[in-house]
């Protein structure tokens, strides 16, 4: 768990996946019924692009700052959100901004809550007026309990609110990153924060009670077998939530590893799978991040066309002109 996204926030890969993510979430608002979003690798939620970590790499200068300056028309929705949210939004902040708010007739005072789950523990809630509790080592403590030793339940009105509204569940396993994530959503009745593995959440949190939703998987790709782990996670998640939309980000260094991942997923028998890929350059140097892709299972209507337009706009806005730069839309499995 050495990966820290603060060093890479706002880079070209972030812009690509977040612009596509915004379009996916918007698609769910076309119907009035509530939807659920699971963000399996949420991070801290928002990032200071003027901070030491971001400045050390300068990746945002060649990413989001270029797009904000060039303003490609197909990215207006995404870029307007980035501007309006203050600190640069990570995926959970972006998703939350796109979710439909609870109507004023449903909201009661003091009923915001944020669920915290420790690895191996069942769901529990933290009182809304409490600061995020810490263990003796400064890390997140176990979920709070009542004086009788039983796990505290959220207020009834909060539970009712979450049943009637769009809902987001964020998972983060890094003990330092989960604390600011909990603070960010501590009073939000539509958001749950889980201190647990996102891979485990694919079993524990699916299927959702809302019956429709999006699973966003954005792993750090720290290990050599991450593509295999991702393929297995998608297979297990789809097995529990077959009609859900799954979106998984992956890096492109060399083409062979990516095509092997696609072939593995095709062998699972999962239907209706596409991938949208963006290349900054030809993927010939395995030491560089040459591009990235977003694989989508059960994509919304016309998402392939919309996704290609968004990816083309990202590439154009970044001003990339290296040999091999481009966008590709791949049909991995038919409907």
Language model features with spans:
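Compositionally biased, low-complexity flexible segments
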Residues: 122-124
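Class I S-adenosyl-L-methionine-dependent methyltransferase catalytic core
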Residues: 1-117, 134, 144-335
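Acyl-thioester-dependent acyl-group transfer interface
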Residues: 141
């Amino acid at each position: 768990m050495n990966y820290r996204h603060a060093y890479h926030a706002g880079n070209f890969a972030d812009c690509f996946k977040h612009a596509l993510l915004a379009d996916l979430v918007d698609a769910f608002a076309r119907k009035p019924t509530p939807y659920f979003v699971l963000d399996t690798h949420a991070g801290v939620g928002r990032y200071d692009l003027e901070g030491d970590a971001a400045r050390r790499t300068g990746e945002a200068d060649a990413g989001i700052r270029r797009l904000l300056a060039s303003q490609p028309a197909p990215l207006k929705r995404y870029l307007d959100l980035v501007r309006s949210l203050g600190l640069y939004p990570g995926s959970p902040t972006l998703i939350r901004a796109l979710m439909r708010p609870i109507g004023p007739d449903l909201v009661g005072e003091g009923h915001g809550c944020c669920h915290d789950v420790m690895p191996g523990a069942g769901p529990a809630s933290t009182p809304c007026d409490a600061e995020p509790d810490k263990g003796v080592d400064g890390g997140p403590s176990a979920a709070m309990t009542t004086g009788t030793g039983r796990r505290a339940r959220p207020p009834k009105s909060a539970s009712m609110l979450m049943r009637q509204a769009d809902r987001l569940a964020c998972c983060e396993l890094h003990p330092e990153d989960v604390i600011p994530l909990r603070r960010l959503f501590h009073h939000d009745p539509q958001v749950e924060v889980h201190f647990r593995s996102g891979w485990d959440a694919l079993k524990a949190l699916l299927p959702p009670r809302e019956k429709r939703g999006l699973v966003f998987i954005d792993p750090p790709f720290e290990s050599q077998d991450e593509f295999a782990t991702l393929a297995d996670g998608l297979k297990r998640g789809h097995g529990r939530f077959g009609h859900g939309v799954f979106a998984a980000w992956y890096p492109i260094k060399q083409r062979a590893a990516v095509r092997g991942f696609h072939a593995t997923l095709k062998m699972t028998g999962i239907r209706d799978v596409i991938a949208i890929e963006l290349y900054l350059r030809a993927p010939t140097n395995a030491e560089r991040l040459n591009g990235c892709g977003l694989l989508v299972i059960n994509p919304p209507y016309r998402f392939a066309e919309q996704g290609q337009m968004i990816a083309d706009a990202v590439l154009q806005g970044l001003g990339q002109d290296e040999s091999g730069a481009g966008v590709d839309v791949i049909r991995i499995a038919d409907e």
